[in-house]
Amino acid sequence: MSDDHAYQAISAYDQRLIQTPNIDRIANEGILFSNASVTNSICAPSRAVILTGKHSHLNGKIDNGKPFDTTQVTFPQLFQKAGYQTAMFGKLHFGNNPKGVDDFLILPGQGSYINPKFIGKKKDTIIQGYVTDIITDVTLNWLDKKRDKTKPFMMMYLHKAPHRPWWPSPEKFAEYYEKEFPEPETLFDDYQGRGSASKTAEMNILTHMQYMHDSKIRPETLESMGQVQPEIKYIRGESVVRPGPNGFMGP
């Protein structure tokens, strides 16, 4: 799961600005969803809806500040009860630890892009590096070395990116310097010079999507592990921030 990206940031849906071949492969070899609804487009409430299958007024998570009600049943608990080995790595943003997972390493709240702190099942730790790379490495290590290969598994791989502040690796940002981005009709309505600023921001967002998600766990990585044959690989966005006219942005 990624954070705050729109469907246009995946080239399986829109090829004008960005290429995400690894995500596209999942779409091409599986199912590409063309119809969707958003029950809540705020970070933690959206995740609560996804994990519980209940609307926000039923699961009680209506904002990012109030802790999640841990008496609510989440789908990892159901997998765990059914005999699956369960794990969760990345951003949860619930204000408390997840239930129904055998192993977890999650960011506190929103987390940091650089040298982030993590909350673990046994202890908290600070890991040096870039958060997207760290979450990916932890996930791959669990798949390869910590997973009980005699059991089916359910693993949640949850990225912080591309949530603001949009902070890609510097070497990746340059990939979009020469790309032309279409400008909306209202771009220059209010103040001069917005073109270059808007273009820079969009390059930043698209770089987040390509580098932080498409270039991470490739389908062939799972295949190379041989015994890893997940029945379902599911990628989705948790919520989206949409640029609007006259400088406004919102869910």
PLM region spans:
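Formylglycine-dependent sulfatase
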Residues: 1-251
